[in-house]
Every structure is written in structure tokens, then in C-alpha cells.
């Protein structure tokens, strides 16, 4: 069962490699490929540094210190995950436009201007860091909560200041979690299409999409995708090593929770202000500006409602299919541990690369299935396949954690009473892990709602999601119009993200 589920994730990647190494003509110059790759590396480096600084600082503040608002900020700091990165790009590019009212006021009144343009490599790095720092924050928060206070207390007794105790004791012990969180942020950076394409930054993922849409060349797109696959494999390895290292380190010795250190009034105000700044810059300011600009715009209600229906429908179906496959993977992971590692490569792979891997078999299938109805159904099936292949590993993690909490003796008793392995899974293991299944479904739902490149490349004709609708408006520089589908997307995803972040913030150390 597990191997079959893993094959679902790996087959599109095999298709990409086979297409890239085939004999077909590929209209891609080495200089273009090098430029895409170097820009991707430079952008990833910026995001890695900024997300590490922001995520580590926020995690250490909420885990180790007491200040006003700490309890609700501990989950609010993860809320930027509800917004796709392109939403932040639209908001900040419009707010800080060179000809906009804010920049004109800054130059005329304050005599200063922005040190860089938002539509640049530096601007993209800042925006993506604000969008993806929660990956580092959540990983570091979990790692710090799992640390015992004994080591830090020993350092303090030896005369170390709080800052020195953190940098020399707590942070080194949390390095595996830091590596895992940064790796996830960089994965999302490499996979991003909507934000970097809108900001005019030429990375590998927009190059893949452009090779298909502009040149109609699957071979060129596949060859651009090869470096992305290599980056994905390295990042997934770093993330897995970081995760296993964090799990290993957190279980050492006798555990005692960290003691919250009260901060003096000025430092407490700075801590609250820093956390509020992250939530504001990562969610409230860009979306608030978009809401302000769209007030006078009457939305195209029929298109907007249809796009919302498509988004929710695809996300629900994809969540059900992906959770089913991830459950098979988790149930078989004991006998086939390699299957989970194979499937994890799909999560590190950008949606555009998944789409390229499915385009050639899709072309064959579309010729075999006559009529528009068959083509429509095939397009939806390919979309669901791409979503499931990419997000199976994301659903696998909470399901595996839920299954490990099922008492082995209960499973053994079921088998001794004559139930088959499948019967035991249906009657015992999966019902007891229903909370983990629900969590996994929400994770997939949110990611599918925000997915853009795979949807853009594989969707049937006239099937627009909210993300695609927003992208179409943004391409025409109609950012006020793009606000409606963008904010509706965030509102639909926000309840799921709120539930997930509250669950994470209230979990005890050692719990998934």
C-alpha cells in the first residue's frame, strides 16, 4: 500500500527527468538557465537569512519571556500562512509604488525615499520572508518548548547573561529544527510563482511556466525544472535530517519546562511591538491596503462566486484524496520506510514541475478521451493528481504522528481476534487517529487554496480558481480588482489556519 502511494508522488518527477534527458528540441539557452538558477539561489539566500532572524527571535520571545499579549501572539504569529505570497506582493507593490501617494509624500515631506524598489530582487526577498517566516517560527517554537530548562539554568548559574545562554546553549540545541524550518521556507521560495513573476524576478519556477505558455515547449520547461529537482532533493534531505535531529535532541535527559522570564516595561513593550510588527507586516498591512483600494471597485460577482466554488471544490476533493493516500503511506511506513522518503520529494517539488511531469501523459490521454466532457474530467483528475503528489508528504506527517499514539497492544489484540491488517486499520487505527486525519486534511485544503502554477498549467478551459483569477487581474495591473479574489481566498483559508495555529500553540511538548 505504501509503495503504491509513493509511486503517485514520484511518477511525475520521473516524467520530468525523462523528458529533460530525451531527444526533443528544447529552446532554452544555457545563459537563460544560468540566470534563472543564480537568481533563485540569491533569492533563497535572502529568504533563508531573514526568515531565520525573524522566526528565531519571535520563537525565543514567546517561549522564554513574559510580556503583554504573549499568549495570543504565540498563535497569531503563524497567521501569515493563511495568505499566499502573491497577496503580499500585490499589496506592497501597490502601496510602495514609485508614483504612489505614500512615496510622493515620503519624498516631499520627509526628504527620503525607499532604499530599494519592491519590484526587485531585494523587494521579493523581503516579501517572501514576511510570508514564510512562520515555518521557522513554528519549528523553533516546538524545539524550544521541548528543551529542558536545566541546561539554560546551568549556564545562568555559571554567570552567562540571558542572551549568551540563548546563543550558546538553547540555539545550538535547536539547530536541527532551525535547519528544518529554513529548508521549508526555501522550498516555498523556490516553488513560488505568483509573487516573483509579478515582481519581475526571473527565478526557475516562472521560467518553467514561461517555457510552456510562451514557447509551448515541454522539453524546455523540463530542462529548466531539472535544477529545481536537484534543489528540492537537497532541501528535503536537510529538512528530514533537521527533523530527526530535533526529535533526537528533545528526548535527552530529564525534562523540565522553560521558565518564563518577566521583562521590564520597556523591553516588554519592545517584545510586544516586534511580534505585532511581524503579524502586521506579514498579513494586516498588505491585505488592509488591498481592502482599502478595492472599496470603490464593484466585483464581477458571477466570476468571483464561480472561482470560489472551484477553489473550495478542488481543495476539498484534493484533501480527501491526499489524506487517503497519506494514510496508506503511514500505515505501510513500518514495513516500507523508504516509501515515505520517496513521497517526501514530492512536497519539496514546485507545483509547476509537477505539472510539467503530467503534461505529456495528459496530451496522450486527451487524444484518447473524446469530447469536451472527457477533456474536462481529465483536466480535473490531473489537477487532483498534481495536488496529491505534491502534498502527500505534508499530510503524512500528522497522520503518522497520530498513528504512533495508538497503543500497539490494541492493534495486536485486534489481529489476534482474527481481523486482517486492513480490517484493523479501518476498525481501530484510523478511527483513533481521526484528529490527525482532520489536521492533515486542513493542511492540504489550505495549500491547495493557495496553489497557483500547477492550477494555471493543468486546469480545464474556463475553470478559474481564486488564485488564478487574482493572477489574471494582476497581469493586467488591475490590482484593485485583484483584491476581491485575493481577500476572499484568505477569508476562506483563515478558519483552517486559525484552527491549526491554535492547536499548535496549545499542544504540550512532545505532542504532534
Regions found by a protein language model. Give the residues of each.
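Membrane-water interface segments at the C-terminal ends of transmembrane alpha-helices
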Residues: 1-23, 31-145, 173-193, 221-240, ...
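Short, charged juxtamembrane terminal tails flanking transmembrane helices
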Residues: 157, 503-512
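Short helix-to-coil transition segments within interhelical loops
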Residues: 65, 144-174, 201, 406-407, ...
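Glycine-rich helix-loop "coupling/hinge" segments at transmembrane-helix boundaries
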Residues: 190-216, 450-479, 512
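Juxtamembrane helix-boundary/capping and inter-helix hinge elements in multi-pass membrane proteins
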Residues: 65-69, 145-150, 160-163, 214-218, ...
